[in-house]
Structures are given as C-alpha cells and as structure tokens.
A protein has these predicted regions:
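Cysteine-centric redox/oxidoreductase cores and disulfide-bonded domains
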Residues: 2-6, 10, 22-25, 97-181
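Extracytoplasmic thiol/disulfide redox context detector
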Residues: 1-101, 162, 166-181
Length: 181
C-alpha cells in the first residue's frame, strides 16, 4: 500500500513538473514574440552593421564586444553558417562593451564603417586580439599597428572615432541589450 502511495505521489509530482516546465517555456516564447513584434527596433537599429541578404527571413542578432575572445572565436562559425545558407540569414551586430577598453575599439569600428571598411577592420581586430586585449591589462594603443591591414586611412579614423554620435550608438546598444535582458 505504501508503495502505491509513493508511486502515485511520484507520478503526480513528475506530471506537475512537466506541466510547469511546458507552461514556463510557452510563456517565455510569448514574451520573446511580444518583444520581437512590439520592439523590433530593439533588435535592429539603423546604425547596426549587417552581413547577409536583405531579403533573409532569419535575423541573427549578436551583441558583441570586439575585445571578447569568445566573440572572436565564434565569428568564423557565424560567417560559415551564413555562407552555408545563402540568402536565408542576415547577421546584425550590436555592441555590448563588457571588457575594459572596449568602447575604444568600438569607436574605431564605427569610424572604419565610414570608410566602408567595417568588416575588414573587425576581422583584423579579431585576428590580432591576443596582442592588445588582455582582460587584466588591455593595451588599446597596440591595435594601431594592425589596422593598416584593413586598408584604413588612420588619420581619418583618429578624427572620426571622436564623433559624439558614436558614443550615442554605444549607449543605444547598451540600453537595447538591457531591455532584452
């Protein structure tokens, strides 16, 4: 008799757990659907760099930090995924400057975008990251020796990266990241 009560209680608890998990999962999906439909600009801003087809139905929004080792490691994999699915995926990059000195590198990227060299500059940054992006001792000045590989006008980069509009882009991306939790 005790076994039947124990077994019955276990089945009820397992069923309750499964129902609660399913409910939670559905609520999360509804919440993200609501965010996507009612706050589309939270995912993609006019200033956001994009890669892939404009007609893509799948948007991959990545909040990244140019000083992040994981971001650098995943970048080639993301590009492979986009290339393996031509016309189907659009990558949207947003900024999440979590590491010391990241704002500096984002400003360089945004200045490079004005020269039409955003993706080349990001690739150079990711490849040279071990030389300048120590988490305990970042050395932003060291990036300048690698930037000529992106074909940039370095004097213009130094001027453009101080534009207050770039700071507003960083602030907007941080605010959107917080909104999305």
């Amino acid at each position: 008799m005790k076994y039947k009560i124990f077994a019955g209680t276990c089945l009820v608890l397992i069923g309750l757990f499964a129902a609660t998990s399913l409910y939670y999962k559905n609520e999360q999906a509804r919440m993200y659907d609501f965010l996507a439909q009612n706050n589309a600009s939270t995912f993609v801003r006019d200033h956001s760099p994009t890669l892939g087809s404009e007609d893509a139905k799948v948007f991959l929004v990545e909040f990244m930090d140019p000083a992040c080792e994981t971001c650098a490691a995943f970048s080639p994999l993301v590009k492979q995924m986009i290339n393996a699915n031509p016309g189907k995926i659009k990558l949207v990059l947003r900024y999440a400057p979590f590491h010391d000195g990241s704002d500096y590198f984002i400003k360089i990227l945004e200045a490079a975008k004005r020269q039409g060299k955003y993706w080349e500059t990001l690739n150079v940054m990711f490849k040279s990251q071990p030389y300048w992006a120590s988490h305990h001792n970042p050395q932003p000045h060291k990036i300048w020796q690698f930037l000529p590989k992106a074909g940039l006008d370095l004097d213009q980069i130094k001027k453009d990266m101080n534009d207050p509009a770039i700071e507003k882009i960083i602030e907007q991306d941080i605010a959107d990241a917080k909104t999305l939790n």
